[in-house]
Amino acid sequence: MAHIDPLAREDLAELEPGFELVEQIMGFVPNSMLTMARVPGLLPAFQGLGAVVLANPIIARDLAQMVAMMSSVGSGCRYCQAHTGHTAERMGVSPEKLEAIWTFETSEHFSEAERAALRIAFHSSQQPNAATSTDFDAAREYYSDDEIAAIVAVCSFFGYLNRWNDTMATTLED
């Protein structure tokens, strides 16, 4: 049971354009966004940041979604794990890869470049932060500093979502 109930979408007509965009990407409007709508200005700001972080041309969208999922795995947020897995599949990540994400370090489904990105995602989402210079050195073998910054941006964006949803005990949609 959620600590704070989400608002009804039909009562948020001014936010409908943003809801429609999210619905195109995810297939539904998350309860987390309907709860964020309780704070004036928060949801549009959050959606703006999300658009920059998740739809930038610096890293591929499927990689961004795998990074988001691994960040949520590292933080332990089940709500975000469900959403990122669902969205990753919609972005073209294979079901085999999604099932193997828990063992990305050894799975044949992941390239060394993907492992480097997922390692940063997993380590940076732990408390205390476990990302090391070794993680960044490994990532630099495959990614530019701009690409690494984009990977960390995804981790940070989902750090907010992981904290929000775990704290609010956001209820997963049907």
Positions of PLM-derived features:
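Hydrophobic alpha-helical segments
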Residues: 1-174
